Amino acid sequence: MIATSDLAKEYGARVLFADVSLQLNAGSRYGLVGANGSGKTTFLKVLAGDEEASAGTVTIPKRARVGVLRQDRFLDDAQIILDLAMRGDAVVWSALGEQRRLMEATGEVDAGRLADLEDVIAAHDGYTLEARASEVLEGLAIPTALHRSPLATLSGGFKLRVLLAQVLVGGVDVLLLDEPTNHLDILTIRWLEKFLGGYAGCAVIISHDQRFLDNVTSHTLDVDYGTITLLSGGYSTAMRSSVDLPSPLGPMIATRSPRRTVSDTSVSTRFWP
């Protein structure tokens, strides 16, 4: 699902990571761990295309949809909470919006275009989008009574829950989540664990919550010593199987995995010199 080849990121003389070649697969959830400042968020940004690497490539299937939870993104306070969550499925949201505008327009209706939009909506289970968005919002403890209220109704922490809901509602193939448990209580964390446990795509998750990583992730990516090491198992399993070297989340260094590559003519690859 995501392949990196000889990926590197440097800031001047400082090397965050180099020569990183990984294959991250659908159906797997990867916990991204390491010291503060080690390059976890930078690696996530490179995967998302938000930041350029210094060298190497990132390859993702062209039709794959990617959802990213960023810590530095904010939503419009004037927007309706439910609408913001529904916008997470950009394909359906756009099709529903165009369908509504065509049907409300005066004059002759473009029946062909309406039929095309109907096909798009049906193919993406679009008529359940509102119900799915409501379910995710409720799972994140945003009550139904507030779903049609402006975002400004909520406190800062709950606004971030709406942002998380938007990413989860999208039905994407790849989830890149930077600290998704921030501002969540124990009940909503448990709900998120269950949601991610049933997620069929490829997920890469940054979190300082060890229990959350144990409950959710199937693999661990350790950012340390200028490289990124792929380990089998969640946080605790990876820790037990690793060499006993110091790390802020525990001893997480192991022998680097052999380089893996991917070849697929239907992929989108970003190259850096």
Which residues does each predicted region cover?
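Residue-level marker of motif borders
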Residues: 31, 247-248
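Low-acidity, Ser/Thr- and Arg-rich intrinsically disordered low-complexity segments
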Residues: 236, 240-242, 247, 256-272
